[in-house]
């Protein structure tokens, strides 16, 4: 028995307090129940490890036989291999060979057109026999644990999954070699190879300092309480006695823009994103009202009680209470004053229209805060800053603090699952919690809760410098961009200079938000006039990138897709030419190649660094990857050797890229690295 083995496992699961399933082996009550395999010669096997119907707890023979199969396996086929691998490893099995993940390969074949990737959904699309049996579904709905489901029924289901996965793998391999999809072969190999490393990172975990986490939580909560007190006073100054819930986008909109729609149900329909400014302003005026500050008085109709007692026909007062509609049961009436409430901002265009009024999202408030700063509207600037900070703190507490508290396992590690199939471009995603959403840089306090697993160890973070810009310079073969990269030209200072010269004083730090935005399809639309001048100048400055953007549009119209140098494909089946010559979906058409090429570089580097560290017999381990960075838990006294390993990977990248994709990436790639006692204090 040897060759390709298709494998599926069944395990028990637990739930968090919020009802989210915990599928991993690091949760104490979770158990491996059953492993089913199928060989290419048709041989099927079932290995039981835990079930309420088992007559013995001795699983040594099952372990021996399964390990024999794994030892003779040349390729392990799974649907969602990370899950299978960590369960095998945690149960004591060894497998370090190649894998073929049918879920990931199907994801790549979707070419950015997302469809569900569960085995059941994929099997249905491929018309394979893999429907969960009715009795099994019913037992799961009743709340039975996997190890309580009828043993024969569970085995039938697991074997059905294995058969479907094997058949799916054969279909996917055949598709790989078709003319239409052949460009994906190299990226499929990279994706499957990386999957094993990401499972390893998941299994290793990232050590969490619980004391530091409590300290950060206390600091966030204290700051939040102070903000709420400040905002309570600011809201009173802005709107008077009107009760305001700042968590309501509708009420926040009325404060920021000092207007309220007449009818929310028809509000959005009054606007078109292509309407002229004069028509937009008129539509706002005709369909919304100015909001005024109010003074609260006791309702005269109910004497401030919020209700009236029922008066009988004979004039006597009954016990029944009737809601006072004058005050809406509050006992208070709010009398409008002559002073307009709120900050009195005007939305610049129909793009700012929202269901509740006008946009109050993060970007909109950030832009308005910038406007307030330039106009020296200090009160508005402070209010908007406080609102944005309050929103950020709420996110930090709910997503990061609570997430880390919930998902840190008994081994005091957060096991970071990096998913390859969640984003359109292949960029890694994570959840439980989503560490990819952490603010960039080394000032975010949450990062200091992540430490080395060794008492004197350090955390090293290696980060690519301006990776997306370098990818775009290569893709557009832009001479000027390449020259700026090679000479170390300060592009952020240049951006600040352009915007400042256009009449809006801008710091280098503020300019960073704009420098590379055009690479991802952003335009000057919705920006200030001075900021828009930079976006216009970007196109004329980087002629190679601009020309490449035009070529992409032509490619999409000719073939319905974009193919990157690494072979990734992105389909745009419904792309159309616009009357003015552009195409629909142009933002995505420009964005996907840059982001996906950057992603492939990072993923190739992850494998290089890991392989180099293993060849050097280092104990240090990769524990995370966020955006364009690699995070390494560094064993004491190995810091310099790890840095040397990173330098070696940087030097090898061009040659490895050429060997892997037959593409000469002729733009220098730079990995900057920092180290510290925790993830935040890396310098």
Predicted regions and their residues:
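Short active-site loop/helix that positions an aromatic residue
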Residues: 13, 82-93, 105-110, 252-261, ...
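Function-dense linear segments that define catalytic or interfacial modules
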Residues: 417-502
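Polymerase palm active-site segment centered on the conserved acidic dipeptide of motif C
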Residues: 213-250, 538-548, 637-683
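Conserved "right-hand" nucleotidyltransferase catalytic core of DNA-directed polymerases
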Residues: 1-10, 15-17, 27-30, 34-41, ...
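Conserved catalytic core of nucleic-acid polymerases
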Residues: 196, 203, 301-324, 330-333, ...
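Short hydrophobic beta-strand that contains or immediately precedes a catalytic carboxylate
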Residues: 6-8, 99-100, 246, 459-463, ...
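Active-site-proximal helix-loop-helix substrate-binding element of RNase H-like nuclease domains
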Residues: 28-33, 37-177, 495-500, 506
């Amino acid at each position: 028995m040897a060759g390709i083995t298709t494998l599926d496992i069944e395990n028990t699961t637990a739930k968090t307090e919020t009802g989210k399933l915990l599928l991993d082996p690091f949760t104490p009550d979770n158990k491996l129940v059953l492993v089913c395999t199928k060989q290419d010669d048709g041989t099927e096997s079932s290995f039981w490890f835990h079930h309420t119907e088992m007559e013995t707890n001795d699983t040594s023979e099952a372990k021996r036989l399964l390990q024999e199969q794994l030892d003779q396996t040349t390729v392990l086929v799974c649907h969602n291999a990370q899950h299978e691998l960590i369960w095998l490893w945690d149960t004591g099995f060894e497998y370090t060979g190649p894998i073929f993940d049918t879920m990931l390969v199907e994801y790549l074949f979707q070419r950015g057109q997302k469809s569900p990737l569960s085995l059941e959904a994929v099997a249905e699309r491929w018309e394979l026999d893999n429907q969960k049996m009715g009795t099994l579904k019913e037992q799961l709905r009743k709340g039975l644990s996997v190890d309580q489901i009828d043993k024969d029924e569970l085995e039938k289901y697991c074997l059905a999954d294995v058969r479907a996965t094997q058949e799916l793998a054969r279909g996917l391999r055949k598709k790989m070699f078709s003319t239409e999809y052949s460009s994906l072969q190299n990226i499929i190999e990279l994706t499957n190879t990386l999957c094993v490393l990401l499972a390893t990172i998941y299994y290793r975990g990232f050590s969490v300092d619980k004391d530091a986490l409590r300290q950060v939580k206390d600091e966030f909560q204290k700051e939040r309480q102070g903000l709420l007190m400040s905002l309570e006073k600011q809201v009173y100054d802005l709107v008077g006695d009107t009760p305001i819930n700042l968590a309501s986008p509708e009420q926040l909109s009325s404060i920021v823009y000092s207007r309220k729609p007449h009818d929310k149900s028809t509000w959005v329909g009054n606007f078109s994103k292509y309407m002229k400014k004069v028509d937009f302003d008129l539509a706002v005026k005709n369909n919304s009202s100015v909001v005024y500050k109010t003074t609260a008085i006791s309702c005269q109709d109910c004497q401030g009680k919020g209700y009236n007692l029922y008066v009988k026909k004979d004039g006597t007062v009954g016990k029944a209470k009737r809601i006072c509609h004058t005050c809406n049961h509050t006992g208070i009436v709010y009398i409008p004053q002559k002073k307009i409430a709120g900050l009195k901002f005007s939305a610049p265009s129909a793009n700012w229209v929202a269901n509740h009024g006008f946009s109050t999202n993060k970007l909109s408030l950030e832009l308005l805060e910038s406007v307030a700063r330039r106009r020296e509207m200090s009160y508005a600037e402070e209010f908007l800053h406080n609102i944005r900070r309050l929103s950020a703190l709420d996110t930090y507490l709910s997503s990061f603090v609570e997430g880390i508290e919930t998902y840190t396992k008994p081994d005091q590690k957060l096991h970071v699952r990096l998913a390859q199939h969640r984003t359109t471009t292949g960029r890694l995603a994570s959840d439980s919690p989503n560490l990819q959403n952490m603010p960039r840089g080394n000032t975010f306090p949450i990062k200091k809760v992540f430490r080395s697993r060794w008492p004197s160890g350090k955390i090293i973070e290696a980060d690519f410098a301006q990776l997306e810009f370098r990818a775009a310079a290569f893709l557009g073969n832009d001479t000027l961009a390449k020259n700026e990269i090679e000479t170390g030209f300060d592009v952020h200072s240049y951006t600040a200079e352009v915007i400042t010269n256009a009449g809006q004083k801008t710091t280098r730090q503020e300019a960073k938000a704009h420098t590379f935005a055009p690479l991802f399809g952003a335009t000057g639309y919705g920006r200030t006039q001075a900021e828009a001048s930079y976006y216009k100048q970007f196109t004329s400055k980087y002629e190679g990138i601009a020309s490449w953007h035009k070529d992409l549009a032509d490619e999409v119209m000719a073939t319905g897709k974009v193919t990157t140098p690494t072979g990734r494909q992105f389909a745009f089946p419904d792309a159309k030419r616009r009357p003015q010559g552009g195409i629909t979906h142009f933002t995505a058409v420009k964005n996907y190649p840059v982001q996906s090429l950057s992603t492939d570089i990072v993923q190739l580097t992850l494998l290089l660094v890991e392989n180099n560290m293993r060849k050097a017999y280092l104990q240090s381990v990769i524990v995370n990857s966020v955006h364009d960075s690699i995070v390494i838990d560094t064993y004491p006294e190995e810091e310099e050797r790890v840095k040397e390993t990173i330098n070696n990977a940087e030097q090898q990248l061009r040659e490895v890229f050429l060997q892997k994709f037959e593409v000469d990436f002729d733009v220098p790639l730079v990995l900057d690295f920092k180290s510290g006692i925790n993830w935040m204090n890396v310098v």
